[in-house]
Design a protein with these regions (language model features):
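Intrinsic disorder/low-complexity segments enriched in polar/charged and small flexible residues
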Residues: 43-46, 115, 210
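Asp-based, Mg2+/Mn2+-dependent phosphohydrolase catalytic module
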Residues: 1-20, 112, 121-235
Length: 235
């Protein structure tokens, strides 16, 4: 039997979750932009004398300007951020949809899902287009929030766009910062192994851990039903 939105941790260990909406992170969940992101941040890191590998890791899952503020507290943050974004928008080589992403999005009614990303709106639109994914009816970007992940604000806004509360939604994430944001918003969080290892994902609060969206399926709402049933495929 499908459980109500108010679920305990024990209940979420089963293989289905009843929810009113699904909130997707973009990079590392729906889209693989890793090569492009690495190229842009490697150039930035070398220009400022930082270790590229460390910077690329730190930048994942957070607004670019947050990374810049952390690493260059005395810099012109807006100017640096505009330069990073310009390079990211121009570099879409190798940006592709991740396994199962297109199929899962098509299985969910458009009004029941949203993208919640640390990208700017323009960058998100460019990557969605490059990956050949459908444009979301609802999207929350760094342009829409005062506080980025791991703050819950982005996911709370995403839930609101779906006419739901955080506790009524499932968040699908890959980054520890995003997982913490989803949990802080009250959502159940499905973590993908596209970026971090299982231990780090669990420590961040993930309820489920799967390889990619191909391991998830949805029984869609029918005839005006409010809820979806998100399932985890079992072997």
């Amino acid at each position: 039997m499908a459980q109500s939105p108010e679920r305990t941790l024990d209940e979420v260990r089963v293989n289905s979750i009843r929810c009113r909406g699904v909130l997707f992170d973009l990079d590392g969940v729906l889209v693989d932009s890793t090569p492009a992101v690495a190229r842009v941040w490697t150039l930035w890191a070398r220009r400022h004398g930082f270790d590229p590998e460390t910077v690329v890791r730190e930048a994942h899952g957070k607004p670019s300007i947050a990374t810049i503020r952390e690493l260059l507290p005395n810099a012109n943050h807006e100017a640096e951020n505009k330069e990073v974004e310009r390079r990211e928008i121009e570099d879409t080589d190798g940006v592709i949809a991740l396994p199962g992403a297109l199929e899962l999005l098509r299985a969910i009614p458009p009004e029941k899902w949203a993208i919640v990303t640390s990208c700017t709106r323009r960058l998100a639109e460019v990557r969605i287009g490059a990956a050949g994914l459908p444009n979301p009816k609802r999207m929350v970007t760094s342009n829409d929030t005062n506080n980025g992940k791991p703050d819950p604000e982005p996911y709370l806004k995403g839930a609101h766009l779906l006419g739901a509360t955080g506790t009524e939604c499932v968040v699908i994430e890959d980054a520890p910062a995003g997982i913490r944001a989803g949990k802080a918003a009250g959502a159940h969080v499905v973590a993908l192994r596209t970026t971090a290892g299982d231990e780090e994902l669990r420590e961040s609060g993930a309820d489920w851990i799967v390889n990619n969206c191909a391991e998830l399926s949805v029984d869609p709402a029918n005839n005006g039903e409010e809820y979806l049933l998100l399932r985890r495929r079992t072997k």
